[in-house]
Every structure is written in C-alpha cells, then in structure tokens.
C-alpha cells in the first residue's frame, strides 16, 4: 500500500469512531486507521491468505500471519481482532453502527459483493465505504461488484483506493 493510500485512510479514520477493515493481512493499513481514529478498528481477516499469497505463506508455520499482525499492531488497544470469514464476522457484529468500511479482502466478484452486502447494513448514512486495489486491468470481479452495488464510487487520485459516501 502506497503512502498516498495510507494518508487517505488516516484522514478518513480521523472522522470515524467505528471502522471495519476487511482484509488486514500484516496490519499496515490497520495501523493507519487505528493510529488516527478516536474510536475502534475491527480488523476482519482469516489470516490464512489467498492463492495469490500462497508462496509467501508456504514459507512459514501455520498461524504465522496472525502472529505477525499482532506483533505489528502491539500496543494499540483500539483494535478488535475478528478472526474468521468476513460474512460470518458481519453476522456476529450485526449490532454495530459503522462510520467507515474499508474492503481489502477477497478481490473476486463474490468476495467484494458479499463484503458489501454483509457490512453495509451497519454503515450509517453518510458513512464511508471504500476499498483497495481498483486496478481495471487486473481485478475484473472487484470492478463488476462495485459497478453493481456502489455505482457512485470514485477513485482517489494517485491511488488504487475506491470510495463512496453511503446513502
């Protein structure tokens, strides 16, 4: 994730008291959110990776990725670890009212669609729905889901972050 992308997340976090991050990986974007929000970041991930990260994960012991995330975010008491598939975690946290949702999990059509449909019922009107890796030549499924479910989105200049205000 680029410095410009981290700066955008930090700015959004400063206006948000309840944030869900779907796809936390090693915690770099989680840090940008947690260090700049006056509230809580719910970090949602299986910490098992995807096929794209298979080679990197294969070099380590099971559980390594979550351990790395915890090490990288140590000392921040405003991060709630939600270990499991995004849709299941959304069901467990259905009572939340969210100011921001950041999607950087599975970039397939089904993955992005399910993340949007599962979490946006908790997003307050005017809240921020955004995500990472808007790359038209690479993530076709992500683009298809966005055009169907969040057609008013825009891409933040000089980044691959897509964003929209939720109505």
Describe these PLM feature segments.
Residues 4-167:
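S-adenosylmethionine/decaboxylated-SAM
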